[in-house]
């Protein structure tokens, strides 16, 4: 169990988990506010 916790605390694993969370958050924001990520063209 200690080896598994050490594996989870390594940088590539933490970066992968962080990017999955960030991507999910951006997808949900884009679902409710579809034009929020676009620059308004005037």
UniProtKB/Swiss-Prot annotation:
Its main location: plastid. Signal peptide: none annotated. GO terms for cellular component: chloroplast thylakoid membrane; photosystem I. SUPFAM superfamilies: Subunit IX of photosystem I reaction centre, PsaJ. One of its GO terms (biological process) is photosynthesis. It is found in: Plastid, Chloroplast thylakoid membrane. It comes from the Eukaryota. Coiled coil: none annotated. Disulfide bonds: none annotated. Keywords: Chloroplast, Membrane, Photosynthesis, Photosystem I, Plastid, Thylakoid, Transmembrane, Transmembrane helix. It is a single-pass membrane protein. InterPro entries: PSI_PsaJ, PSI_PsaJ_sf. The chain crosses the membrane at residues 7-27. Pfam families: PSI_PsaJ (PF01701). May help in the organization of the PsaE and PsaF subunits. Belongs to the PsaJ family. This is Photosystem I reaction center subunit IX. It comes from Mesostigma viride. The gene is psaJ.
């Amino acid at each position: 169990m200690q080896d598994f916790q050490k594996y989870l605390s390594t940088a590539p694993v933490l970066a992968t988990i962080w990017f999955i969370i960030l991507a999910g958050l951006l997808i949900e924001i884009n679902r409710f506010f579809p034009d929020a990520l676009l620059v308004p063209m005037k």
